[in-house]
């Protein structure tokens, strides 16, 4: 499998290391976030893996779609335009997979959280909130992973209807609001926690990333899956689509 990497930052370099160690695939091209990109840049590639920033992705995604090469996207912070991107992917009969986090471990965390949120829904004594920690270089907050975790809760627990990213002084949190607290600290790779609390006890679910290897390995594995899916069923996919196949195999 010939892979073009869009983005030569920490995640891009980690993916290149994982690919080199596997011996099964090759990175045939690396495009920098500041490069001018058109569809021809992806000629000869089997799959594209994009880990850039919001502004670069928004500038580049038309070329990604037009290339006809399946695209794995790990860039976060563009949820507001996702419906538009999805529509363009489907219209062009292209193939794209998006996830805020490709780590298998964190996706098991999502599924565990989904079930926990569903289980506490009938019991009003249990409240729930989220927190996330990342290094000081991470620009977006809450993280894409935290937003995905919040969506899991909102979709599984009807008592929570909206996300609150910041609390103003003197403002009381409403019972139907889900607080998502963000911390930027040092060189933390990523810590995501769900806290479920009642008068009697507290339950904590936490995923801690020790390094970027899990993210990179998951992205490469997702790329393998997407290449096969592109051949038979082009479209816009999420990590859940990939994991449903993976866990049912």
Swiss-Prot record:
Catalytic activity annotation: (S)-2,3,4,5-tetrahydrodipicolinate + NAD(+) + H2O = (2S,4S)-4-hydroxy-2,3,4,5-tetrahydrodipicolinate + NADH + H(+); (S)-2,3,4,5-tetrahydrodipicolinate + NADP(+) + H2O = (2S,4S)-4-hydroxy-2,3,4,5-tetrahydrodipicolinate + NADPH + H(+)
Superkingdom of origin: Bacteria
Pfam family, one: DapB_N
GO biological process, one term: diaminopimelate biosynthetic process
Residues noted as binding (S)-2,3,4,5-tetrahydrodipicolinate in the record, renumbered to the chain: 135, 144-145
UniProt keyword annotation of Amino-acid biosynthesis present: yes
GO molecular function: 4-hydroxy-tetrahydrodipicolinate reductase; NAD binding; NADP binding; oxidoreductase activity, acting on CH or CH2 groups, NAD or NADP as acceptor
Keyword Cell inner membrane: no
Binding residues for NAD(+): 32, 74-76, 99-102
Subcellular location: Cytoplasm
EC number: 1.17.1.8
UniProt pathway annotation: Amino-acid biosynthesis; L-lysine biosynthesis via DAP pathway; (S)-tetrahydrodipicolinate from L-aspartate: step 4/4
Active site annotation, chain numbering: 134, 138
Keywords annotated in UniProt: Amino-acid biosynthesis, Cytoplasm, Diaminopimelate biosynthesis, Lysine biosynthesis, NAD, NADP, Oxidoreductase
Gene Ontology CC: one annotated term: cytosol
Family of this protein: Belongs to the DapB family.
Biological function: Catalyzes the conversion of 4-hydroxy-tetrahydrodipicolinate (HTPA) to tetrahydrodipicolinate.
NCBIfam families from the UniProt entry: dapB
Protein name as catalogued: 4-hydroxy-tetrahydrodipicolinate reductase
Species name: Chlorobaculum tepidum (strain ATCC 49652 / DSM 12025 / NBRC 103806 / TLS) (Chlorobium tepidum)
